[in-house]
Amino acid sequence: EAAGLLPFPRV
């Protein structure tokens, strides 16, 4: 989803 935007990718 917001991988790269947030410091932790949603899995």
UniProtKB/Swiss-Prot annotation:
Name the InterPro entries for this protein.
Periviscerokinin
Q: Name one GO cellular component term.
A: extracellular region
Organism, as annotated: Karoophasma biedouwense (Gladiator)
GO biological process terms, semicolon-separated: neuropeptide signaling pathway
Which compartments does it reside in? Secreted
Keyword flag RNA-binding: no
Q: What does this protein do?
A: Mediates visceral muscle contractile activity (myotropic activity).
Residues the record lists as Valine amide modifications: 11
- The name on file for this protein is CAPA-Periviscerokinin-1
Q: Which UniProt keywords apply?
A: Amidation, Neuropeptide, Secreted
Q: Which family does it belong to?
A: Belongs to the periviscerokinin family.
Q: What Pfam families does UniProt report for this protein, alphabetically?
A: Periviscerokin (PF08259)
Q: In the UniProt record, does the keyword 4Fe-4S occur? A: no
Domain of life according to the entry:
Eukaryota
